[in-house]
């Protein structure tokens, strides 16, 4: 990731921390990484349930954020989830995933790697980034 993107990356991490809806991820390691980042929202893992059931559980929240991995498989899962969630009255955030993917996909492949990338960014951050954590 280019240094000029560090600030936006950290802002997106803060957005994840502050999110109060349901976050949909692929697996346990993704959930662990998000918890390490300080995310407190309910996390629903795709590895445990069929997509239709995940969508039903997630739809009980007003807001749902899709946070699949940043590879081709993750992109396909995100599209399928959007289709499943389209029939429910919840608000679905896919834009955060798209922006994160654009920023990090050359550095990492999955959500499970976000915490490690976060630690690297914070360790090399300059004074302009102080206060954003």
Curated annotation (Swiss-Prot):
Keywords: Magnesium, Metal-binding. InterPro entries: TOPRIM_dom, TOPRIM_RNase_M5-like, UPF0292. Mg(2+) 1 binds at residues 26, 69. Mg(2+) 2 binds at residues 69, 71. Its cofactor is Mg(2+). Binds two Mg(2+) per subunit. Disulfide bonds: none annotated. Residues 20-100 form the Toprim domain. One of its GO terms (molecular function) is metal ion binding. NCBIfam families: PRK04017.1-1 (NF003090). PANTHER family: UPF0292 PROTEIN MJ1624, UPF0292 PROTEIN TK1411. Belongs to the UPF0292 family. This is UPF0292 protein TK1411.
